Amino acid sequence: VLSGTDKTNVKSIFSKIGGQADDYGAEALERMFVTYPQTKTYFPHFDVSPGSAQVKAHGKKVAGGLSEAANHIDDIATSLSKLSDLHAQKLRVDPVNFKLLGQCFLVVVAIHNPSALTPEAHASLDKFLCAVGLVLTAKYR
């Protein structure tokens, strides 16, 4: 459960990310594909090489989903309901991949915003990314 402080920290981090969110999403995907190559199996039709147009486009979707969740942090489940349906019913992504991508996103944020990612902010962002992952896997059966 995200505390009031967690919510404030997450909103602060996303305000600092600003217009770079799409790039962060793509960089997180690139990092995930290299660090956890088994995740590429869900993207057989993608050019998963760093900087590819497809990775950038999907990174934009990832960033959009995370930004949507941050903007509706008091009701992440409702804000990501359609994405949850898509991932559970159509794409059938292994739920562990949300955790892996979340870890990669956290690393990207840390690389680009080291002063903003205090230990407290780090913990809050990690809790937020876990909450997003839980929402995205809630409709799995």
From Swiss-Prot:
Residues 1-141 form the Globin domain. One of its GO terms (biological process) is hydrogen peroxide catabolic process. SUPFAM superfamilies: Globin-like. Keywords: Heme, Iron, Metal-binding, Oxygen transport, Transport. It comes from the Eukaryota. GO terms for molecular function: haptoglobin binding; heme binding; iron ion binding; organic acid binding; oxygen binding; oxygen carrier activity; peroxidase activity. Coiled coil: none annotated. Heme b binds at residue 87. The keyword Metal-binding applies. O2 binds at residue 58. Belongs to the globin family. This is Hemoglobin subunit alpha. It comes from Psittacula krameri (Rose-ringed parakeet). The lineage of its organism: Eukaryota, Metazoa, Chordata, Craniata, Vertebrata. The gene is HBA.
